[in-house]
Amino acid sequence: MVIEVKRLGLVPYEQALALQKQLVEDRKAQRIPDQLILLQHPPVITLGVKARDDRTHVLASPDELSRQGVELFETGRGGDVTFHGPGQLVGYPIVDLNPDRRDVHRYVRDLEEVLIQVAASFGISAGRQAGLTGVWVGNEKLAAIGVRIARWVTSHGFALNVATDLRHFDLIVPCGIRDKGVTSLERLLGRPVPMAEVETATITAFAAVFNAAPIGV
């Protein structure tokens, strides 16, 4: 398996949605290989399918979001509500699970394993919590996962807190879970963590877990 990596820097959420849509169609048509898009977003709250009809997990008013410069978008991914912003590494794998990887549960667990390995590369012991999606250190979420799969081609993906301003998570109930916290690599390590190093570690871990040969890096 070959995967083409794109490291795009800071990209507005709406622009990234359009890019994903185009890449998904290209992948379905076999015009491109599997893709791994790595980027950051300006401050934005996104609503998964669980949150589109019930926004009670968005705690801030529209006026407060506007005052803080935080956008709000409905998405087609699974899950509830989450926050994206600068200092958070967002990954959008556009991967064709045909013909022998048609297992949504396995795919999500594999994404978790990628992020567990990334954390380990920085000396952090992260893991899973029973019944919950994502990657955790104790009772604090380090990385969130929310995916969409259409005709077995994936989109959306994961968000790893590197140097995220965690105060923005006070605007929401992250992933609809009220009794857990959030954390970041920088908070756990007590030092700055270069985003480029995290991107490189993510590419390495993704290649290992998915048995992929990265190109374009």
Predicted feature locations:
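Short, conserved beta-strand/beta-arch hydrophobic-aromatic motifs that form part
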Residues: 56-57, 61, 142-162
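C-terminal accessory segment of soluble enzyme catalytic cores
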Residues: 166-217
